[in-house]
Curated annotation (Swiss-Prot):
InterPro entries: Ribo_uL30_ferredoxin-like_sf, Ribosomal_uL30_bac-type, Ribosomal_uL30_ferredoxin-like. Coiled coil: none annotated. It holds the Pfam family Ribosomal_L30. GO terms for cellular component: cytosolic large ribosomal subunit. One of its GO terms (biological process) is translation. Belongs to the universal ribosomal protein uL30 family. PANTHER family: LARGE RIBOSOMAL SUBUNIT PROTEIN UL30M, MITOCHONDRIAL RIBOSOMAL PROTEIN L30. It comes from Staphylococcus aureus (strain NCTC 8325 / PS 47). Part of the 50S ribosomal subunit. The keyword Ribosomal protein applies. Keywords: Ribonucleoprotein, Ribosomal protein. The keyword ATP-binding does not apply. This is Large ribosomal subunit protein uL30.
Amino acid sequence: MAKLQITLTRSVIGRPETQRKTVEALGLKKTNSSVVVEDNPAIRGQINKVKHLVTVEEK
């Protein structure tokens, strides 16, 4: 299965609590932090919810 590298490119300051929790659930803490996760529909849904805050690359 493919892997995705997700990078938090914008801050969560001033964002709704749901978006903050989603970013935290993806494993991102600080701006410019990155995680590599398995590509699946659940992760894709989380990325879609905060797509304006993150960048995604396929690995």
